[in-house]
Amino acid sequence: MNRLFILLLTTFVVSTIVAQPGYTPSKENLEARTKFQDMKFGMFIHWGASSVLAQGEWVMNNRNIRVDEYKNLIRVFNPIDFDAKEWVATAKNAGMQYITFITRHHDGFSNFDTKQSDWKITNTPYAKDALKQLADECHKQGIKLFCYYSLLDWYRTDYQYETGKTGKGTGRKAKSDWNSYIAFMKAQLTELLTNYGDIAGIWFDGHWDQLDNDQDKTLQAKVNWHYDEIYSLIHRLQPKCLISNNHHLLPIPGEDFQAFEKDLPGINTTGFGGADISKLPLETCETMNDAWGYNVTDRKYKTVKQLIQYLVNAAGRNANFLLNVGPKPNGVIQKEFTDTLAAVGKWMQQNASTIRGTRGDIVPAQDWGVITKNTSSMFVHILNKKDNNPYLFIPQFTGKVNTAVLFNGKTPVKFKQQPEGLFIYLDGIKLNDIDTIIQLN
């Protein structure tokens, strides 16, 4: 009986997620959260050895490629056209203020000169540290750098792949060693936070690999991820570094913003976004086509209109928008992406002040659009007015409006405040196909 009790107790301890104990965000961390919310728009970059196969970042798992075969990519990944300056400028010209870069994805390949593994970019024919170049350029151009870091691993044998849901076909036979894997992650995170200057945040992904099913809404996993130790390590090395975990659940103590994948907060079309919305800063990420990593056959490109409206809808729900690109294996961001980003950038040049530095959830999102607010004005974003009424009705509106004008042109707009809400009259106004913005002062 005693042996059974000890076994059950051990199982409970291993499967329980422990948050960072007694976590109180530092003053610098709280300030970083506010600045993060102000930025509103960032670039996600999925890129690495998997890009060579041009079938997306999950190709190792999806095609059941064994480690002894997949490791040959290190001989051919040679991104000779990679230009960190161009990548950062592309993001900046699109109106983005931060970049989240894949330092290590689920295939375990490190895009930096880690001392913890030989499976890294500096052992390819390219032989250079991509993260170092990107970090230096971000710091030079005033763009914040976040590091995506995979919790799961399809390549290493010390990762507890026996209980994981993915990576079953990669040919691993050796018994896993969880303590070794946790030590490996801590060592790599220490490298990221000590060798590359200011890191604005760490973006974790892969917790869900150790859950029984995708509908599991608890933090109980088959392994102990040691989040208490990992989060404490990060906040000790860089106190203002923000932590997010794409576990599709409510954040736990130690996490500084809540991530949503391919869905706006409160909307769950993909099955990833069922978590309740926390009081922390929010971020939603989305792709420019279907794939995250480079996929040569994926031509399902989203339009400029779709992406601008996604950005506006995110801001109206008080969330940042992290828009992904998957560069080619040679290091070039494909023209379809750069052309679209340039067009988004032109829109941002005119309208960024209605997005950047604002907050949302002033009133719930409406069928016709959303509202954002800064310290002096509210911005009514009319994205999709379907009815023929000559007015726009904003329910639950309590602020006192002095004037209303079209944001572009400052033409006065008629309005009337009633107990039930605000009426804005649209007679004589030609609605823009993407976003008609009315500024309320």
Predicted regions and their residues:
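Bacterial Sec-dependent N-terminal signal peptides
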Residues: 1-21
